[in-house]
């Protein structure tokens, strides 16, 4: 392994050999407080540090956690590759964390802060997504540091975080899930959507203003059947195909 020349917050990052579809595998952020944080990284060939670029961080589900093996996330997850096709000039990190709770939420925040500092990242265009357990982690990130991100995409998951900090930050959130998700069901996201919507209403936002920053997209059985998918949870890997999803997500920029 070779050390990157950047040392951020007295943290260093090591690069492992190997790549999968242009992602370098098992980069390790040696964080002084959080310990080692593993992630796979795509830096476009066009990147030269002269212009700020967007940053997107994906939090995989259980099948992509680090104990499953280096690069396991890239064997299953579709969103990092869909994002690269959508904007090949974006830096993309697929994190391989250790759980779907507060430990990984803090690790995800530390990784985000490191990458913003290590590369010429546009701080107004930093995006986070979470699938399955990674979605639970992402909802905790939205409780802790929602202002760090331009938008959050939550796929096939349940909401674990507190909503008030998110409502204060007004970070745009897109939730998508199968009506009969085989692992979570859809009630958790329906409730989170309703409660967050109510918080925005209480803050005086109009329906149009809320619609601009909060979406709940519940897919019925026909949506999956048309794609030959029998399981609505695992079928969440097809969500990047949803028309308008990527455009909505990556069009958001932080205000102010």
Regions found by a protein language model. Give the residues of each.
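C-terminal catalytic histidine-bearing segment of alpha/beta-hydrolase fold enzymes
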Residues: 174-176, 180-184, 190, 199-256
């Amino acid at each position: 392994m070779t050390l990157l020349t950047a040392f951020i917050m007295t943290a260093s990052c090591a690069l492992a050999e190997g790549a999968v579809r242009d992602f370098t595998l098992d980069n390790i952020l040696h964080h002084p407080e959080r310990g080692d944080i593993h992630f796979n990284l795509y830096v476009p060939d066009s990147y030269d540090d002269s212009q700020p670029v967007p940053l997107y961080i994906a939090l995989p589900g259980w099948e992509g956690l680090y104990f499953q093996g280096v690069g396991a996330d890239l064997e299953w997850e579709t969103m990092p590759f869909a994002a690269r096709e959508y904007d090949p000039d974006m830096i993309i990190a697929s994190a391989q964390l250790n759980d779907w709770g507060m430990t990984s939420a803090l690790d995800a925040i530390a990784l985000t802060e490191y990458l913003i500092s290590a590369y010429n990242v546009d701080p107004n265009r930093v995006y986070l997504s979470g699938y399955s357990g990674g979605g639970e982690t992402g909802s905790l990130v939205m409780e802790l540091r929602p202002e760090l991100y331009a938008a959050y995409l939550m796929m096939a998951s349940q909401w674990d975080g507190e909503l008030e900090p998110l409502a204060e930050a007004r970070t745009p959130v897109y939730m998508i899930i199968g009506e009969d998700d085989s692992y979570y069901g859809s009630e958790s996201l329906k409730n989170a959507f309703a409660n967050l919507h109510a918080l925005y209403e209480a803050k005086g936002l109009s329906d149009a203003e809320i619609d601009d920053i909060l979406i709940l997209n519940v897919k019925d059985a026909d949506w999956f059947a048309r794609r030959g998918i029998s399981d609505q949870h695992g079928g969440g890997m097809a969500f990047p195909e949803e028309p308008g999803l990527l455009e909505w997500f990556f069009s958001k920029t932080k205000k102010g």
